């Protein structure tokens, strides 16, 4: 647990467990805190959960570990001796508590996925090597996790592996959802997509989003009355066109 020096008594709510370690150090914000937390990570993969985020159930880590091991074994068979294991991001779906619905991630990460909507960091398990050269770029106040995901895909050539399961529960009403930060998010999104996709491709995708009524679809996805219906349709579309690693294979 990385704490920035909270005084609201939240640390006292942690259960007594020898596996929990608390590191307290001042930080300048969410992404700076996450960068600091990386210095304490000792495993092969890392996931970030922020205030209000929870693993969906007690079996998430066990099921994901099984998928990771199968993928590692298959990769080892194909990569041969002397080759480093491929850097990967394993990701799944998110349950949005405020909307009362599952937010399904795209089963395939391509250029359009990277423009439109990548998986949120709460449902991603990153190979720690993807943070070896650099962490989150804190100049991005709202979109640093988005920028880092594109860095992993385009600069580090990481493989994104979709696992069909709900990984994390998101409380809703978070940092990125305020009106001011939504405006900042749009500006940062334009800068980041131009950098990784190029101006022409980013413009084509922006026009495509407008032609397919993206603003209306966003309102449907965020409306408590229609969110479950909309995301259910999206899940069916994803199921027909994507590939996945099943946790129960």
Regions found by a protein language model. Give the residues of each.
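Nucleotide-sugar donor-binding/catalytic module of glycosyltransferases
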Residues: 1-178
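Weak global preference for isoleucine
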Residues: 20-22, 30, 89, 103, ...
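Solvent-exposed, non-transmembrane amphipathic alpha-helical segments
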Residues: 57, 146, 150-151, 183, ...
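Catalytic core of nucleotide-sugar-dependent glycosyltransferases
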Residues: 165-166, 178-204
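Membrane-proximal basic amphipathic "stem/tether" segments
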Residues: 194-249
């Amino acid at each position: 647990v990385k704490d920035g020096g909270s005084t609201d008594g939240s640390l006292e709510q942690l259960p007594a467990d020898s596996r929990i370690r608390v590191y307290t150090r001042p930080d300048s914000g969410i992404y700076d805190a996450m960068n600091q937390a990386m210095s304490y990570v000792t495993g092969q993969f890392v996931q970030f959960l922020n205030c209000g985020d929870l693993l969906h159930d007690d079996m998430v880590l066990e099921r994901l570990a099984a998928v990771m091991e199968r993928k590692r074994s298959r990769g080892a068979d194909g990569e041969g001796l002397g080759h480093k294991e491929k850097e990967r991001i394993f990701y799944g779906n998110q349950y949005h508590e405020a909307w009362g619905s599952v937010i399904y991630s795209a089963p395939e990460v391509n250029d359009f996925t990277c423009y439109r909507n990548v998986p949120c960091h709460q449902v991603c398990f990153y190979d720690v090597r993807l943070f070896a050269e650099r962490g989150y770029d804190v100049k991005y106040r709202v979109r640093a996790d988005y920028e880092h995901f594109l860095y992993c895909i385009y600069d580090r050539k990481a493989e994104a592996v979709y696992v069909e399961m709900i990984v994390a529960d998101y409380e809703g009403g978070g940092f990125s959802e305020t009106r001011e930060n939504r405006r900042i998010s749009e500006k940062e999104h334009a800068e980041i997509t131009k950098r990784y996709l190029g101006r022409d491709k980013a413009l084509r995708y922006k026009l495509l989003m407008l032609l397919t009524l993206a603003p209306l679809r966003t309102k449907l996805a965020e409306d408590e009355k229609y969110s479950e219906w909309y995301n259910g349709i999206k899940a069916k579309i994803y199921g027909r066109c994507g590939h996945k690693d099943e946790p129960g294979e």
